[in-house]
Regions:
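Short aromatic-glycine-(Arg/Gly/Cys) micro-motifs in beta-strand/loop hairpins
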Residues: 1-15
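Generic secondary-structure boundary signal with a strong preference for alpha-helix termini
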Residues: 12, 25, 37-40
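A short, exposed loop/beta-hairpin motif centered on an aromatic-Gly-Thr core
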Residues: 14-26
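Short, non-transmembrane alpha-helical segments in secretory-pathway proteins
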Residues: 31-36
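Short, mixed-charge low-complexity intrinsically disordered segments
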Residues: 37-56
Length: 56
């Protein structure tokens, strides 16, 4: 597994920063969006952009 830092930008201007271990960048992005949804930041239609960076 690799370590990722994910930044989820919402249409209401909120930036959500999330760190996790995942197999792929796609999986890390999905985990971050789910964590944002659980935190009440917005659903999938509210996401403007998801930026995934692998930490080496």
């Amino acid at each position: 597994m690799k370590h990722f830092k994910v930044r989820v930008q919402y249409t209401n201007g909120i930036d959500f920063l999330f760190e996790c271990d995942a197999v792929t960048g796609w999986q890390a992005g999905a985990l971050a969006r789910v964590a944002g949804r659980i935190a009440g930041l917005g659903g999938s239609m509210d996401v403007k952009e998801t930026i995934v960076v692998e930490v080496v």
